Regions:
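Single conserved hydrophobic/aromatic residue that forms the stacking wall/gate
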Residues: 1-11
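Acidic donor-binding segment of Leloir-type glycosyltransferases
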Residues: 12-33
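Phosphate- and divalent-cation-binding pockets in alpha/beta enzyme and binding domains
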Residues: 22-23, 114, 158
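Conserved donor nucleotide-binding strand/loop of the catalytic core
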Residues: 31-42
């Protein structure tokens, strides 16, 4: 998570869930604040909730840039353009790589309460409908205002399967 608007004051927060102890032993997170998501079994939405809950008390933060941990090779041009693009307070900013939207995405504070309310809805041990939650699909399907930024290069590789390495 990167927080704040513009490139002036940027704060890094890393939300870790499953295998968080192994990750903190093997990766130097430099100047990042590490947040632990104890409810990682719920899927990505619980990590988003963890980060937003932590940030919500700081009224100086007006937006959050959410990255996926399996996409370490985000072009710095994308980050800079997302942070510097003018947008409405109720408008999500999403990069489009050629013809495919992707991460990171900029979410204004306006949406945080709505995202914090999404929880695992199944208590019988079955997978929640949010287990494979996709943030971009959520905003598209809820007809939220979105500003799309076009980039003329391919979406960064997801390193989420053994075959990706």
């Amino acid at each position: 998570l990167l927080t704040s608007r513009g490139l002036g004051d940027v704060y890094k927060r890393q939300v870790l869930g499953h295998e968080n102890e192994t990750l903190t032993e093997k990766i130097d997170f430099k100047n990042s604040t590490i947040l632990i998501n104890e409810s990682w079994e719920e899927g990505i939405i619980s990590s988003i909730r963890t980060g937003l809950f932590y940030l919500s008390s700081d009224k100086n933060i007006d937006g959050v840039l959410i990255f996926m941990g399996d996409q370490p090779a985000i072009n710095s041009e994308v980050i800079e353009k997302l942070l510097l693009t003018k947008h409405d307070d109720d408008e999500v900013v999403v990069p489009q790589y050629r013809y495919e939207t992707g991460y990171p995405i900029l979410i204004p504070r306006y949406f945080w309460n709505k995202l914090e309310l999404i929880t695992q809805d199944d208590i019988d041990g079955d997978d929640s409908v949010f287990k494979n939650f996709d943030l971009i699909d959520f905003f598209e399907s809820s007809e939220s205002k979105m500003k799309i930024l076009n980039f003329n290069f391919l979406k960064p590789t997801d390193f989420d399967k053994q075959s990706d390495f």
